[in-house]
Amino acid sequence: MKIRVYFFKETDPEIILRGNKISSQALNTIYDLVWENEFKNILNAVRIWIKFMEEEQPFGTPLRKKKNHYKISLGDIIQISNDFYMVDKVGVKKIKVIE
């Protein structure tokens, strides 16, 4: 199971939080892929969110050294296989990525 974490590049995540879907083009332009790994165990998005909230370098070295922020925060996206979850004020919510 492939896990990816995307950090939001913009300054106001409230705009993106209003909807429950995002286009794949927006995902590639306003988000940076900062971390990717493959797991054999089944993980859920909340466990990954907690891991990123609590640790300085969760799961090892990030893909990108230059980031807008260093901790997972509001508006960031966690991808687990083909499912996408957006970090909300508390926890995560499932979103749809459309072509």
Segments predicted by a language model, with ranges:
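Short, conserved turn/kink motifs that form compact alpha/beta structural patches or helix kinks used as
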Residues: 22-80
